[in-house]
Amino acid sequence: EYRVGRDVFRSIMHEQGLHLIRRSRAIRTTNSRHNLPTYPNLIKNVIPMRPNHIWVSDITYIEVEDSSAPNGYRFVFLTIVMDAYSKRILGWCVAPTLEAAYSIKALEMAIKTLPKDFNDTLIHHSDRGTQYASAAYIKVQTDNHIIPSMTENGNPKDNAIAERINNTVKNELLHGMTF
């Protein structure tokens, strides 16, 4: 395992001739218009007081070069599950589609980080996307005694911690890189 800061990471990537292609238009990764059950926002005005009190999750896209694609690039989707207290990324998955199964993989990775004797309240907060509202995703949460929480009316500010880590990953860690 190697740990490097943003600037060293950028320097290494520059030395290797790798650059990220940034797009000016946003890609929608959230479909909040569905008939799946949604859950109330349980973290509004709540400050996380310990690790594994609140987890936040979101999905972002990363553009990659693909010579077989008509325009020479395509997108992959990164799901991140992060502890809101420690800001530690506990689970992640890079996937070719937005299917819920990939978000579940990130959640399951995060669950594996919990202590065996963990029995405190754990809230999982996300947007209202179909991945997070799917029966399969909710089942993994409830089977592991995790309480679902979702943004109100699709407001990204209600999931600001997760949105911020996405911004950091794309615009600081991966800035200028090509995949």
What are these regions (language model features)?
Residues 1-179:
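Charged DNA-binding/catalytic regions of mobile-element recombinases
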